[in-house]
Amino acid sequence: MRTGLLLLLTAGVAAAAVPSDANLDTILAKIQQRYERQRDALCGYTGTRVYTLHNSHLSHDTVMKYRVTMSRSSGKHFKLISEQHAGFLARHALTTLVDAEPDSRKQEQQGRLDRANYKFALLGEDVLNGHRCYVLHLSPRRQSKYLVSGKAWVDVESYAVRRIKGQLAKSVSFWVGKPEVEEDFANSGGFWMPSYNSSLSHVKLVGEATVTIRFSNYRFQRCGQ
């Protein structure tokens, strides 16, 4: 997950013809510049995540709410706030996803959109939630649970990644396998952060399961403050 990256399913989106002024090298360079500006400005944050597991064999959806704290010095930490209808297997499946959350520094290096991690192709333009985006095809250069084989939607104006959709390039765990994932990002207080994540997994002993994650209540520690 991506949360960093992990986690779903929406219908595929057809890309329009590639605009004449689009250049893949320029797009990737501007993505990197925007990433570096955010990395240099953001020293930590706290937030809330609500994980929901749906499975046809369960009488109720399992919901687990976490408080997330991230800092450059200590990485990312989760604290369980509440849970509902969390039977043993469902709880184990969700805690496995949380435990698989990558170390922030490792995710920065191994999961970001750059030529060290991916081969790219510019598919064209699309409108996503009212915003013009470039659509990039993502082909991971190696098997990694931090990489996605699929597509990325990049905002034409800000060069921020608004959506990543596809399948993880490597199994997250024995229990979860390789989920089909979709993660949306939004501007929060000047920083582009995950806002919604959904994944379809085939969980051992539970069967096909859909997991959604809703991100909220971000509070940021800006560097130098």
Question: Where does each model-flagged region fall?
Answer:
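Positively charged n-region of N-terminal signal peptides that target proteins for export
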Residues: 1-4
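Structured extracytoplasmic
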Residues: 17-149, 156-161, 169-179, 186-193, ...
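Generic leucine side-chain signal with a strong bias for well-ordered alpha-helical environments
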Residues: 6-9, 28
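Hydrophobic h-region of N-terminal signal peptides that target proteins for export
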Residues: 8-17
